[in-house]
Amino acid sequence: MAKQKIRIRLKAYEHRILDQSADKIVETAKRTGATISGPIPLPTERTLYTVLRSPHKYKDSREQFEMRTHKRLIDIVNPTPKTVDALMKLDLPSGVDIEIKL
C-alpha cells in the first residue's frame, strides 16, 4: 500500500500571521494522530517596484516599494480520516493563501 501524503503550502505577506496559521495546522494534525514534517520555511519572494516621485519630470528622483511574500511548507504523512475532517473545519486568517496537494 502506498503512503499517503498531504502537502500544504502557505503564503502570506505577514510572517506572524503565517506562523500562527502553520502552528494551528500542525497542532490540529498532531492532535488527530498524524505524522508531521514541518513547517519548513521556504525562500521569501521579494518584489521591488520603482516609481517616479513626481508626476511629470525629474527622473532622477525615484521611490522604491517592496512586497515580500513569506512561504511555509507542511507535509502530513499518513493522515487519518479524523485529520482530514479537522483540517477542513479549521478556521484560518484571511491573509493566508493555502495550497493543498494530495
From Swiss-Prot:
Oxidoreductase keyword on record:
no
Q: Which GO terms describe its biological process?
A: translation
In terms of SMART domains, this protein maps to: Ribosomal_S10
The protein's GO terms of the molecular function aspect are: structural constituent of ribosome; tRNA binding
Top-level taxon in the UniProt lineage: Bacteria
Which keywords are on file for this protein?
A: Ribonucleoprotein, Ribosomal protein
Cite the PROSITE patterns for this sequence. RIBOSOMAL_S10
The family line of this record is: Belongs to the universal ribosomal protein uS10 family.
Annotated HAMAP family: Ribosomal_uS10
* Subunit text: Part of the 30S ribosomal subunit.
The entry's function note states:
Involved in the binding of tRNA to the ribosomes.
UniProt name for this protein: Small ribosomal subunit protein uS10
